[in-house]
Amino acid sequence: MKQYKQIIENYFKKHSLVESIRYPGLKSHPHYEVGLKQHKGPGGMITFEVEGGIEAGKILMNSVHLCQLAVSLGGVETLIQHPASMTHFSMGKEARLAGGITDGLVRLSVGIEKVDDLIADLEQALEKVKEAHLVEETV
């Protein structure tokens, strides 16, 4: 399971539409050192920022096939959530941003599916974000 998260994290680091990754297993995470002392591992929750804002987050979330749409994240299957259009929708944008909930933020709770299948599913969903022309192409 740990290697799955590492493979997905590495995939996100290389993808042009993923602007940032928040994962307690990253040394750059502000609570990385505390996590080493308190937990056996950083867990399966990976949060990433997809370029293109709310529409990009919705397209990604609605385009994956293996991930289950979830408001609450927990279980053995991979779950996906777009907070700006789901759990935090009723908050004003300023309040969401103050809490670190940006428009393109997506939460992914990695389950037990085959990692290659998850990567392929995320890739085809991110391709749909690109096809929606919500972000500028870079040369």
Descriptions of predicted regions:
Residues 2, 6, 40, 54, ...:
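Electropositive phosphate-/nucleotide-binding environments in soluble metabolic enzymes
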Residues 2-4, 25-29, 50-52, 75-80, ...:
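Glycine-rich beta-alpha junction loops
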Residues 6-65, 71, 91-97, 134-139:
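Conserved small-domain helix->loop->beta segment predominantly found in fold-type I
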Residues 73, 78-139:
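PLP-dependent enzyme catalytic core of the Aspartate aminotransferase-like
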